[in-house]
């Protein structure tokens, strides 16, 4: 518990991160999940990385990603991060819905971006061409105009940039999920 709490320490220059998000009108972050996962999120009081869940025998009813995405997470040392997006209409979300998944969109306070170990990726962090890190320059690499676009098609030059990510180390406490009680 104490170890988890230590992950909530803010970056020393967190106000600079807040200024960039504010300049770009980012007021909420998003995480989509299968509706069947909501009870588990409530029970364990937050969103946890799949790696943390594995280590602590927390069963995820419908885990996101597959074997390949987990291999990529490990390759890029991102296996202990919870993925968030700047956009409400992530292309992966659309694909999963067409496959019949019952998804819900969780809204997360931007404050998680200020945690010391939170990183930012300019595109989907599973993409071999991504750049990620936890410095201000990494956040500045995000193409916020692309993240604000709606229903971006694969042919659009902003398709990859639309999928920029916020990578929160290990967990997001339930108090940061503003709409959890809507489900």
Stretches with model-predicted labels:
Residues 2-183:
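Active-site-proximal loop/hinge segments that shape catalytic or ion-binding/gating pockets
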């Amino acid at each position: 518990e104490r170890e988890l709490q230590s992950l909530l320490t803010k970056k020393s220059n967190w106000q600079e991160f807040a200024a960039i998000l504010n300049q770009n009108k980012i007021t909420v972050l998003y995480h989509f999940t299968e509706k069947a996962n909501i009870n588990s999120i409530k029970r364990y009081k937050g969103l946890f990385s799949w790696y943390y869940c594995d280590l602590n025998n927390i069963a995820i009813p419908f885990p996101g990603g597959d074997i390949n995405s987990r291999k990529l997470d490990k390759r890029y040392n991102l296996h202990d991060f919870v993925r968030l997006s700047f956009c409400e209409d992530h292309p992966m979300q659309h694909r999963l819905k067409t496959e019949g998944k019952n998804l819900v969109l969780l809204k997360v306070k931007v404050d998680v971006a200020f945690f010391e170990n939170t990183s930012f990726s300019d595109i989907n962090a599973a993409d071999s061409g991504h750049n990620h890190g936890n410095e201000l320059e990494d956040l500045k690499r995000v193409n916020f105009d692309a993240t604000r676009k709606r229903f971006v098609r694969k042919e659009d030059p902003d398709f990859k940039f639309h999928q920029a990510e916020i990578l929160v180390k290990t967990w997001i406490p339930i108090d940061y999920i503003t709409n959890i009680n809507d489900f």
